[in-house]
């Protein structure tokens, strides 16, 4: 009887796995790798301990070959409904299907049961991930009668029990117990399947940005003196403010160095609590009151504004500088700096600072303190309507565009006054292209070769362009080949090279012509060089003795 039960349990386990495969829960490769491990039957205490026949039967049973086991999954003895002394069914054993997908399902049934006495079937579903709409289907044994289930359900026409779980979280377990009553002897086969939809949850954090703007600026300022405003922007909300933009129209009577009438500052995204500061500087052009208004806007929010009103007083100081627009390198250039007080206030502690670009050398600046490329004049007082003039003599060592910046600072009852000016001079270099011609073999025998080498060098401070070279040889020499930075052409006893587009300052290029001595005599080779800088072509002659 025990052997029969062992075989029945093994068939049941395989049938359960097959049912899972047929329901689509298991893939073929997974089903092939599954195995069933059945807990051996617990020894049941014989009712007649004195029966020798029973002992012999158990002894013979222990010598039988173990049932061929196809291990599918770990087998666990159920602790929920273990065998009791007065129960009509054996210990529970569990068949577990390992599935790393959505839901893991196990089924526990007794090793044996008694006809006419109910026995339990325990189904446990474990969430491998968050799932919804979990449907568990239990196929009732054919030769058994449904008694009850927990949770309660009603069998379908084809003998199936169906439970629906709205949601099964990851790691969460759901247990179902079904009681059935076997109607006749034999094996009661049962199978359970599960279907589930994986659940994905997303979280969107909602908040409200709140952009505030404040502005700081002077109450009084002087005409033509810089007026600086600080615009402070802060996000006092709970969410990120997107695409924050600050617009600051230039007030009437003000000018900005960019020449624009509306200044726009793109701050991008601002996190909660983030603070930004913008500094704007204007130059007042007329007296009176001027109000600077800054407006901040952001995506989906209201615009906020902040304003500061400044009273503009009389002008304080003016400065200008004049000099040559262009000059040649190493040629002195004089700049004239003019400082004046067009207002009605006395200027005190006037400082005139002239800063020259690197590469420019100060040659002379009367009454000034010279330090490297900086020249400074100081004046104790500059009365209204009074003007001062300073001269500085400079020279550039290299070609290029250099700017001379002048800043005047002073104090008055109106406060600190500053004015600035600049002058730019373009310093040009001068190209100086030279040529040198030599022959490598002299004298040479008739039939031998010699090479004429022509070196072209730009010794000047500027590049030369369209540099062309032509060579003419007497009848004693016959050009054979040539080389150089450009292509050439041999026509009779003349070699012409294509123009070189550019010859940089201090750059040298070399041309060479290989010649064959064809007759004895005092041969001559003439090189003619021309370029955009050379108004008249330059020629050089080399002689070669042929014997």
From Swiss-Prot:
<dbReference type="GO" id="GO:0042597">
    <property type="term" value="C:periplasmic space"/>
</dbReference>
<feature type="signal peptide">
    <location>
        <begin position="1"/>
        <end position="22"/>
    </location>
</feature>
<dbReference type="InterPro" id="IPR051172">
    <property type="entry name" value="Chlamydia_OmcB"/>
</dbReference>
<keyword id="KW-0732">Signal</keyword>
<dbReference type="GO" id="GO:0008360">
    <property type="term" value="P:regulation of cell shape"/>
</dbReference>
<feature type="compositionally biased region" description="Basic residues">
    <location>
        <begin position="52"/>
        <end position="61"/>
    </location>
</feature>
<comment type="function">
    <text>In elementary bodies (EBs, the infectious stage, which is able to survive outside the host cell) provides the structural integrity of the outer envelope through disulfide cross-links with the small cysteine-rich protein and the major outer membrane porin. It has been described in publications as the Sarkosyl-insoluble COMC (Chlamydia outer membrane complex), and serves as the functional equivalent of peptidoglycan. It is present but the disulfide bonds are reduced in reticulate bodies (RBs).</text>
</comment>
<dbReference type="InterPro" id="IPR047589">
    <property type="entry name" value="DUF11_rpt"/>
</dbReference>
<comment type="subunit">
    <text>Part of a disulfide cross-linked outer membrane complex (COMC) composed of the major outer membrane porin (MOMP), the small cysteine-rich protein (OmcA) and the large cysteine-rich periplasmic protein (OmcB).</text>
</comment>
<feature type="propeptide">
    <location>
        <begin position="23"/>
        <end position="40"/>
    </location>
</feature>
<dbReference type="GO" id="GO:0005201">
    <property type="term" value="F:extracellular matrix structural constituent"/>
</dbReference>
<dbReference type="Pfam" id="PF03504">
    <property type="entry name" value="Chlam_OMP6"/>
</dbReference>
<dbReference type="InterPro" id="IPR013783">
    <property type="entry name" value="Ig-like_fold"/>
</dbReference>
<keyword id="KW-0574">Periplasm</keyword>
<keyword id="KW-0133">Cell shape</keyword>
<feature type="compositionally biased region" description="Basic and acidic residues">
    <location>
        <begin position="62"/>
        <end position="79"/>
    </location>
</feature>
<feature type="region of interest" description="Disordered">
    <location>
        <begin position="45"/>
        <end position="84"/>
    </location>
</feature>
<keyword id="KW-1015">Disulfide bond</keyword>
<dbReference type="InterPro" id="IPR003506">
    <property type="entry name" value="Chlam_OMP6"/>
</dbReference>
<dbReference type="InterPro" id="IPR001434">
    <property type="entry name" value="OmcB-like_DUF11"/>
</dbReference>
<protein>
    <recommendedName>
        <fullName>Large cysteine-rich periplasmic protein OmcB, serovars I/J</fullName>
    </recommendedName>
</protein>
<dbReference type="Pfam" id="PF01345">
    <property type="entry name" value="DUF11"/>
</dbReference>
């Amino acid at each position: 009887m025990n052997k029969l039960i062992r075989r029945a349990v093994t068939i049941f386990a395989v049938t359960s796995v097959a049912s899972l495969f047929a329901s689509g829960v298991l893939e073929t490769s997974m089903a092939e790798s599954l195995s069933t491990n059945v807990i051996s039957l617990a020894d049941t205490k014989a009712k007649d301990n004195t029966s020798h026949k029973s002992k012999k039967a158990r002894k013979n049973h222990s010598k039988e070959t173990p049932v061929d086991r196809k291990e599918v999954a770990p087998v666990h003895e159920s602790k929920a409904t273990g065998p009791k002394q007065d129960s009509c069914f054996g210990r529970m054993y569990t068949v577990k299907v390992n599935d790393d997908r959505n839901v893991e399902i196990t089924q526990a049934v007794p090793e044996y049961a008694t006809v006419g006495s109910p026995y339990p079937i325990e189904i446990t579903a474990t969430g491998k991930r968050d799932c919804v709409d979990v449907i568990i289907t239990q196929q009732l044994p054919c030769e058994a009668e449904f008694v009850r289930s927990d949770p309660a359900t009603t069998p379908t026409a084809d003998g199936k029990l169906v439970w629906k779980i709205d949601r099964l979280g990851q790691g969460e377990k759901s247990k179902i117990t079904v009681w059935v009553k076997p109607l006749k002897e034999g094996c009661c086969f049962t199978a359970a399947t599960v279907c589930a939809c994986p659940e994905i949850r997303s979280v969107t954090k909602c908040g409200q940005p709140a952009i505030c703007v404040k502005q700081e600026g002077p109450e009084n300022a002087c005409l033509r003196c810089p007026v600086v405003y600080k615009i402070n922007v802060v996000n006092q909300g709970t969410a990120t403010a997107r695409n924050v933009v600050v617009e600051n129209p230039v007030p009437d009577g003000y000018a900005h160095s960019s020449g624009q009438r509306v200044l726009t500052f793109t701050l991008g995204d601002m996190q909660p609590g983030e603070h930004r500061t913008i500094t704007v500087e204007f130059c007042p052009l007329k007296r009176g009151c001027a109000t600077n208004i800054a407006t901040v806007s952001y995506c989906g929010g209201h615009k906020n504004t902040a304003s500061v009103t400044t009273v503009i007083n009389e002008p304080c100081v003016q400065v200008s500088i004049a000099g040559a627009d262009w000059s040649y390198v190493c040629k002195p250039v004089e700049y004239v700096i003019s400082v004046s007080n067009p207002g009605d206030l006395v200027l005190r502690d006037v400082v005139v600072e002239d800063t020259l670009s690197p590469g420019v050398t100060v040659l002379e600046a009367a009454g000034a303190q010279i330090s490297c490329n900086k020249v400074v004049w100081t004046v104790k007082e500059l009365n209204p309507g009074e003007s001062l003039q300073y001269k500085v003599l400079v020279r550039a060592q290299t070609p290029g565009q250099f700017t001379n910046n002048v800043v005047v600072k002073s104090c008055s009852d109106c406060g600190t006054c500053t004015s600035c000016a600049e002058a730019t001079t373009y310093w040009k270099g001068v190209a100086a292209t030279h040529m040198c011609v030599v022959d490598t073999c002299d004298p040479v025998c008739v039939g031998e070769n010699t090479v004429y080498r022509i070196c072209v060098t730009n010794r000047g401070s500027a590049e030369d362009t369209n540099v062309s070279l032509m060579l003419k040889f007497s009848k004693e020499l016959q050009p054979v080949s040539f080389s150089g930075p450009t292509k050439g052409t041999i026509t009779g006893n003349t070699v012409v090279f294509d123009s070189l587009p550019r010859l940089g300052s201090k750059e040298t290029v070399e041309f060479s012509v290989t010649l064959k001595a064809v007759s004895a005599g005092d041969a001559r080779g003439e090189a003619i060089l021309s370029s955009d800088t050379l108004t008249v072509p330059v020629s050089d002659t080399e002689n070669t003795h042929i014997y």
